[in-house]
Amino acid sequence: MPFTLGQRWISDTESELGLGTVVALDARMVTLLFPASGENRLYARNDSPITRVMFNSGDVVTSHEGWQLKVDEIQQENGLLIYTGTRLDTLEENISLREVFLDSKLTFNKPQDRLFAGQIDRMDRFALRFRARKYQSEQFKLAESGLRGIRASLIPHQLHIANEVGKRYAPRVLLADEVGLGKTIEAGMIIHQQLLAGRAERVLVIVPDSLQHQWLVEMLRRFNLRFALFDDSRYIEARHDSDNPFETEQLVLCSLDFARRNKQRFEHMLEASWDLMVVDEAHHLVWSEDAPSREYQVVEQLAEQIPSVLLLTATPEQLGQESHFARLRLLDPNRFHDYQTFIDEQQKYRPVADAVTLLLSGEQLNNNQLNLMGELISEQNIEPLLKAANSNSGESETARRELISMLMDRHGTSRILFRNTRNGVKGFPHRELHQIKLPLPSQYQTAIKVSDIMGAKKSLEARAWDMLYPEQIYQEFEGENATWWNFDPRVEWLLGFLMANRHEKVLVICAKATTALQLEQVLREREGIRGAVFHEGLSLIERDRAAAYFASEEEGAQVLLCSEIGSEGRNFQFANQLVMFDLPFNPDLLEQRIGRLDRIGQSRDIQISVPYLENTAQAVLIRWYHEGLDAFEHTCPTGRTIYDHYYEALLNYLAKPNNQDQEKFGEFIDQCRQQHEQLKQQLEQGRDRLLEMNSNGGEHGLRLAEKISEYDNDTELVNFSLNLFDIVGINQEDRNDNMIVLTPSDHMLVPDFPGLPKDGCTITFDREQSLSREDAQFISWEHPIIRNGLDLILSGDTGSCAVSLLKNKALPVGTLLVELIYVVEAQAPKRLQLTRFLPPTPLRILMDLKGNNLADQVEFESFNRQLNAVNRHTASKLVNAVQKEVHAILQQAEGLVETQAKSLIEQAEQEADENLAAELSRLEALKTVNPNIRDDELEAIEANRQQLLLNLNQASWRLDAIRLVVVTHQ
């Protein structure tokens, strides 16, 4: 095409320069000025990477003054274009705009505009865009959204609870599973689901001081949720950025003490518009009708303001009924307003539980029992079900399950209280204790005597604490560099134990970080034993590295030495050898130590070795834990109660281990054991088995775990992810253990890829491997790297237009095919979850010049494999040659896509209407027999249904990508 001064062109390789103007010409070169960027470029007249900008009738163009013109007619005058049409701001007709006066900041957003402007993308990017649309659409519609991407084992009861609660509007529930069953993971899954679904955006997590780090780690490692830890300094720092510091972050974690201590701070917290609050260890909130504690009042006021509340607590049997009622009162004060009414109501549910037990037994039901069933489910005709349940046919089991489901719906608190026990959940290992009694070295004996004399004024508690850790006493007198490890027999025993168990991974836990560091040095220097250290002084990344070093099978550490605080929130199920170098002060910490290995998914029995020094507080404590509480070999739900009750007596025995009457101490142990047995029996009798059945999920939980497990083997995810990393420009380094190291490169599509750390990260597509390797992130469709990658591709114009060659001798050379990808979508607030029914859905059309749609006959992937790439310059020439034909095809395609899109929208409307109407009528029917269904929940479902149908009715479609395919024989 001949050049003329004033013509407008665009650079094929530097589209960010905007619209260029021809300002100089000679026989061989042409100069373009790009006013938007102030740049000049010199190009050869022949074969330059620039494209003439020519708009068509129907296009809207912008003048350099800012007004817009809808083009009706195009004329040429001396090689320059004049656009004539209607000015959109004044509606004047027959207004002319010369191309030289077009806005230089012009960008091409529509795929067809980019194609005609020569901004043609690579073929592989077009394919990636289509796949991204397809996969994203499929993921939105899956019912298990929010559960599939968690970095945790697929435990049925956890999945059931998370699925049941996570999909509710403003859930307010009590999670009261026994220790070790994963309440934190359940809460994390619910948070994850609520965030992904858009039901929550701002989350507040309140935990005890000692659990802050554990929560921070669990939320980040398992759910990729980056909480901001608020303490005094963070609060003060955030005040510089906002009047309300809590509004500077969406996900906030803090301690209960932090929330309680300062009135203004608490007011800021109340005003911060949270969507969801989680309170861990909620059983420590002290309440009585006359005098609720300050901590209880803090949580109560927050719970009144925040729509969704999760309380994590001990089991109801451990709490006692009054304390249990206090937690339920936080969730729904209108429903649980009077304690005695609550007790009376609970008694009424006894027949329901008995009926379920009867159905589960499989025995024939007598007339009295049949009448009882009829009374309990009085609003429905269940005669046919009762007959089937009592028959010997194959329908009996199905009928009994349906009756059980109906009875469960009537159970008072099963909708707001979830509680599982180890008895009801299978998969836990046995625990074996090995006590290693060792002599007390003379050096320690001397140090303890001196400490007794000098510490006479110390409190009983302080002296008891000192006596538990003789190496600390020794260092106090001999200095920090005193080499206690040279004579402490526990060190010799540990060396021998590790040498004898060379092929075992061993977790060693001690109270202090200094002890762990000193032991690692001794093991390394004396026997060359590879060890990693894990303590509170390390950063998250350093802890990850230590954990990964310990987890590695080849060249990994044999032993991981942890301090008490440093081990919080980390689990090492791949190991089964636990050494307690010393003992913690209370039963909760003891269970926490064992819980590092004793988790669901542990495949071997846990071996607990405790080397202890005779005639010391350690000897007292090991006997009390083992003989008094049976706390080593079994979980001890009574531990805290007995500890609190006998606290003073226990302190006396610990503070003076040498001066005790052995007979009296034996009686003390017997007393503790008897109380332990009595409490345990009371707990067992108080178990609500109906509640356990509902919390466990049964078959539903198992099916959910199996279904998610099937997604774990998704090869499409692996192929798509690697393709995405290639095109985005992320470096990939394959490791020989099914892991990949991702690092940013200098040529990425964006300078900072969201979700990818600057120093890179290690990923795996294998769930089990991610669980055994602390440093490996588990990649799923829900991982931020993949979700951000999808958003990056689909929110921009990457791959929105391309040109390819099809080598096919069965078709004439030059045959033109146009592949069009339309997207049908509707806009709605995220909380409505419109994408469950109509996600942005791609519609593919493959047109020939005769107006035939070949998409059904020619599948995308097989077609794509037959195509060859073409360079951008040649592609621009091909586009210019067939521009007229492409416009005609686009017009024909509009009619085709309209029919398909309307059908899709109607389907979505019908599905949404039926789905939400069914949910509403189910809950309305239940409300007649179960008062725990809240009115606001019913109102929200109906309001959502109306709003969803309105939004779906306004759904539209648009062209998202276009590809020209030209047939060649070469």
Swiss-Prot record:
Assembly with partners or alone: Interacts with the RNAP. Has a higher affinity for the core RNAP than for the holoenzyme. Its ATPase activity is stimulated by binding to RNAP.
UniProt xrefs under Pfam families: Helicase_C, RapA_C, SNF2-rel_dom, Tudor_1_RapA, Tudor_RapA
Location of the motif DEAH box: 280-283
Name this protein carries in UniProt: RNA polymerase-associated protein RapA
UniProtKB keywords: Activator, ATP-binding, DNA-binding, Helicase, Hydrolase, Nucleotide-binding, Transcription, Transcription regulation
PANTHER family with a match to the protein in the record: DNA ANNEALING HELICASE AND ENDONUCLEASE ZRANB3 FAMILY MEMBER, SWI_SNF-RELATED MATRIX-ASSOCIATED ACTIN-DEPENDENT REGULATOR OF CHROMATIN SUBFAMILY A-LIKE PROTEIN 1
Residues holding ATP: 177-184
Top-level division of the source organism's lineage: Bacteria
Residue ranges annotated for the Helicase C-terminal domain, each copy included: 490-663
Functional description taken from the UniProt entry: Transcription regulator that activates transcription by stimulating RNA polymerase (RNAP) recycling in case of stress conditions such as supercoiled DNA or high salt concentrations. Probably acts by releasing the RNAP, when it is trapped or immobilized on tightly supercoiled DNA. Does not activate transcription on linear DNA. Probably not involved in DNA repair.
Membrane-spanning parts: none
EC numbers for this chain: 3.6.4.-
Domain named Helicase ATP-binding: residues: 164-334
Single annotated GO MF: hydrolase activity, acting on acid anhydrides
Lineage of source species: Bacteria, Pseudomonadati, Pseudomonadota, Gammaproteobacteria, Enterobacterales
Stated family: Belongs to the SNF2/RAD54 helicase family. RapA subfamily.
Coiled-coil intervals: none
Gene Ontology annotations of biological process type: regulation of DNA-templated transcription
